[in-house]
């Protein structure tokens, strides 16, 4: 075997191994993250704020059952007008392409569709408050000394980019603490969304984050 032939065979083998490695990594990505969404898709997930399990559908797209005060991962479908259904309750929804939404199932009335602007800063973590209660709320450190997210009006949204950290937080009305929030580990490049449902003295704050496994 000549030197040129040996080099050619070695290069062919290396190319084959590289292709196999790329295919293996692609397969691993598909297993971890699911299939890629086509261009122009819209993304929707379910947050079940009730005390009983619930499943949902948006058009022909089924969202698997989640437990009480739990959430699904995002499912994708073409943008457009649909009927969203959770249990026996339904609501018409308009889903724009390249947008993210959370369908909230609560004990009060029809499901609500909430837009979730995507977070793309890989160096920071995002804390977002989706305040679906009937009162203005501020997210602070548990001792009340540091404001994490500025006051958020009833049925409003507020957010802040922060450095990744694990911190104890609480909801306040002015200087009055109205409830502690479960600790959450804020990871770089991730968004932790605090959904606040309920009213008066019966507020229910729950962190909604993407689960490890997708639907």
Swiss-Prot record:
Domain of life from the UniProt record: Bacteria
Coiled coil feature spans: none
Pfam families, sorted: AlgF (PF11182)
GO cellular component, as recorded: periplasmic space
Pathway entry: Glycan biosynthesis; alginate biosynthesis
InterPro entries for the chain: AlgF
Keyword set, alphabetical order: Alginate biosynthesis, Periplasm, Signal
Disulfide bonds: none
Name of the featured protein: Alginate biosynthesis protein AlgF
Natural source organism: Pseudomonas putida (strain ATCC 47054 / DSM 6125 / CFBP 8728 / NCIMB 11950 / KT2440)
